[in-house]
Amino acid sequence: MKKLFATTLFLIAAIGLPTLGTAKNTSKNKAGGSSRPVAARIPVQGPAYATREDVMRWADDMASRRDLDRDWVRQAIGQAHFLPGVPRLMLPPPTGTAKNWRVYRSRFIDPIRIRAGVAFWQANRATLERAAKEYLVPVEIIVGIIGVETVYGQQMGSYRVIDALATLAFDFPASHPRAAARQEFFRGELEQFLSLSQRTGADPMTPVGSYAGAMGMPQFMPSSVVRYAVDFDGDGRIDLSSSPADVIGSVASYFKAFNWQPGMPTHYAVRFDPERLDKDALLAPDILPTFSVETFTAKGAVLDGVALSHKGPLALVELQNGDAPPSYVAGTENFYAITRYNWSSYYAMAVIELGREVAAAMPAASTVAR
């Protein structure tokens, strides 16, 4: 579908209901999140960035590079406020904090979210099937993403986007191990946000989203709105907050862009041959699919059934379970594609399993509906 940026497009794409954000909006790498809708929390605001000379110099430079109105950019950034509670939310958990897939899973795969997923699927069945046909991305994956991200629009964030982005662009926590790179990332997102706002006539003070600046039902960052959002309902604008069709099409568009392979499983079961196992070598590439089936099995990872005929590379994915033994799967290129939406294997498995649970609940729900 054509990407259309009408005067109100970006404003519509960005505004969400004032509810608390979810896993992606909080921290892209943490095993956490809430599965139930909660009351909005209005973040405490600190000083306005108009008082920061370094920020105003950055605004001047950005306006020049982007060919934007200098006074407008200075005014917009100057009205953004530091959010004192946000920087700490970006810090990784303390060293030694155990990840726990079972706990993480329980936060996203529960009856409330599954019922919401069934209702979303039933209400948007034709659109989901159209997106799956056009982009060759399974309905289960689209449904899983939207459910994990915002419980199908119930938790889209309560932070003013310009405040969140400015805070992370200019006051990213220096103690973060990748502080420089992450700060540069958020400066780029702030640029995208302001560029879209000025060129579409939208008020940059209005949109709300997550504390990381993600927006709408699919929790797209501004750069993702630019690159992947589509007008899937054909009304001439992209609305990622209240148009399920645009949300569905945009999520499918995202996965197509990240090389989703039609018909390929996301992962396979795996067990180990203790006599040949070289787990360190198998885990060294992390979740990047690297090994052929032959190399995978030669290093002691045992596959069965259809997995033995898999043609692409595989990765050994480890999901820690606290003090209990870890779980393992053989991740494919499609598993890796899900981690491009959120760089976490735990997130990817939650998306996959939520989609499956919703799909499994659909027949019974359809029977009851009759």
Language-model features and meaning:
Residues D69-T97, I146-T150, Y159-T167, A269-L277:
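Acidic helix-start/capping segments at beta-turn-to-alpha-helix junctions
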Residues T8-G16:
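Bacterial N-terminal signal peptides
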Residues M1-T8:
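Bacterial N-terminal signal peptides that target proteins for export
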Residues R237-S292:
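Ligand-binding pocket segment of bilobal, Venus flytrap-like solute-binding proteins
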Residues L68-I77, P138-G144, P204-G209, D235-I238, ...:
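Surface-exposed patches in mature extracellular/periplasmic domains of secreted proteins
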Residues K24-A123, E129-A132:
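An acidic, Gly/Ser/Thr/Pro-rich helix-cap/linker signature
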Residues D273-R370:
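C-terminal soluble interaction/assembly domains
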Residues A98-S250, K256:
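Acidic/His-rich structured neighborhood in mature extracellular/periplasmic domains
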